[in-house]
């Protein structure tokens, strides 16, 4: 039985929607258990309320929990071409796991959202992957066997580095069906590889 964690930070809900799709894909793989958790929020309740961020009652993860999983799929919105500070802060607390080699050989994968088509999707994904590589994780992306990656019928997120969505400059655009298809594919693909490595 492979244990997958979908771990995310989402301010306006785009990444939460993508996380649900990723988890849905992972759950399609028999013999896989999937948990969805979020990293702790760093902004005050007042600041979140003023920004119009919706409440999120998803369980909050602790860094030491990561060692309990065979595969971890991380999701974060883009902040100036990098992961959000909340995810960075969480990963910066995993030094103890790194020192003990607790994540070596575990599967790692990433997904993101950006405000625009060229708003830093790939730099965000690769910056997240860099941290996972320092932990010795086995990085899994989205291969081109996912036909939705080559969809030219719409402006869409999705890269070989990981699923992505375009939120628009005001955050009003929600993940498209094509983007959710890529997210589900990624979740399924990660679970299949995790099963092979954990078995």
Swiss-Prot record:
Cofactor: FMN
Annotated signal sequence range: none
InterPro entries reported in the protein's UniProt record: Flavodoxin/NO_synth (IPR008254), Flavoprotein-like_sf (IPR029039), Flavoprotein_WrbA-like (IPR010089), FMN_Rdtase-like_dom (IPR005025), NQO (IPR037513)
Catalysed reaction, written as an equation: a quinone + NADH + H(+) = a quinol + NAD(+); a quinone + NADPH + H(+) = a quinol + NADP(+)
One Pfam short name: FMN_red
PANTHER family named among the record's database cross-references: FLAVODOXIN-RELATED PROTEIN WRBA-RELATED, FLAVOPROTEIN-LIKE PROTEIN YCP4-RELATED
Protein name, per record: NAD(P)H dehydrogenase (quinone)
Organism of this sequence: Alkalilimnicola ehrlichii (strain ATCC BAA-1101 / DSM 17681 / MLHE-1)
